[in-house]
Amino acid sequence: MSLLDTLQRGLADLDAQGLRRVRRIAYTACDAHMTVNGREIVGFASNDYLGLAAHPALVAAFAEGAQRYGSGSGGSHLLGGHSRAHARLEDELAGFAGGFSDAPRALYFSTGYMANLAAMTALAGKGATIFSDALNHASLIDGMRLSRANVQVYPHADTAALAALLDASAAETKLIVSDTVFSMDGDIAPLTELVALAERHGAWLVVDDAHGFGVLGPQGRGALAAAALRSPHLVYVGTLGKAAGVAGAFVIAHETVIEWLIQRARSYIFTTAAPPAVAHAVSASLKVIAGDEGDARRAHLAALIERTRALLRNTRWQPVDSHTAVQPLVIGSNDATLAAMRALDAHGLWVPAIRPPTVPAGTSRLRVSLSAAHSFDDLARLEAALIEASEAAAASVGAARQEAAA
């Protein structure tokens, strides 16, 4: 069988299981109201939590950065591509989100995936043991696999199980690794307990705050700041394409850790640096996030979250108990979840269907992603469409059962 035959068979299998992904094309800027596939829609799909992706100040900064630094960096960070914009941003990030450390330093990456690969592969290797939450992001998991470290997975957020694994470990280097906000459930890791376990067992704690940075904590400084946590053995990863509204990611840690990443992190060394204009725009984003406007946007988002929690309980499906901008609604089967997504699409609402392998089999769900750009009128439209779709689904199931029993 040829490679193409094998791939065609694989695609057919995905179709049969309701697992093939399809891209949609956005014709306008990322916002609550967009033109997608030629239609006007209200989007509940993006991670633009503060509604900054189309913010005029960020757009202007991006254009200014391009005028000043050009359209590309021209090389890797170690071979000519590290601009003043990158260096300034790293200093700003360390000052903004590095309050957990006495000697914080930041390192900017082109993507969150690359930042997580760097942290896993450069800080752990043969002889090290990584203790990983069962629901960690795929980029962390891939980094662990590449690290060649021993990996022990503990049940989601189960600190007792983690403590038992740490007690039994004789590894010289131990890394506890966890998302802060879990991207498909919206719950927050038990960070206080994780820090305590790390310190008790001489381990380091690596946290991925992709969905918390900019939203959680005072001035949006992140999940560690929200929990008022400090420790010399913390490594903090954040992303800049979600709440920050631009692109890229960063690692903040003790300056020695960051210097080691510069020397040994392959996903930092062997890639072209992001355009300086991107870093310039992120600097503008940090000013908005930390200012009065950022506070107002976070307050509005918090109100939207509480309203959404209430409206999801009015459907026939199972909401996940989330207090973050990620509001999942578990339906179960792939086909039923896709049908629900299509029903919402007919109402001009884009709510993505999340299916395996992103979530466990049998827990396919709609993932409602909220933004400060949404209005309460947008939520009213969502509620009406969800109730209609869930009632129709329940009626269809009931009719099928009656037919089977006849």
From Swiss-Prot:
Its cofactor is pyridoxal 5'-phosphate. It comes from the Bacteria. It is an enzyme of class 2 (transferase). Its EC number is 2.3.1.47. The keyword Transferase applies. GO terms for biological process: biotin biosynthetic process. Substrate binds at R21, H137, T358. Pfam families: Aminotran_1_2. The modification N6-(pyridoxal phosphate)lysine is found at K242. Keywords: Biotin biosynthesis, Pyridoxal phosphate, Transferase. Pathway: Cofactor biosynthesis; biotin biosynthesis. Pyridoxal 5'-phosphate binds at G112, Y113, S183, H211, T239. SUPFAM superfamilies: PLP-dependent transferases (SSF53383). Homodimer. Catalyzes the decarboxylative condensation of pimeloyl-[acyl-carrier protein] and L-alanine to produce 8-amino-7-oxononanoate (AON), [acyl-carrier protein], and carbon dioxide. PANTHER family: 8-AMINO-7-OXONONANOATE SYNTHASE, CLASS II AMINOTRANSFERASE/8-AMINO-7-OXONONANOATE SYNTHASE. This is 8-amino-7-oxononanoate synthase. It comes from Burkholderia orbicola (strain MC0-3). The lineage of its organism: Bacteria, Pseudomonadati, Pseudomonadota, Betaproteobacteria, Burkholderiales.
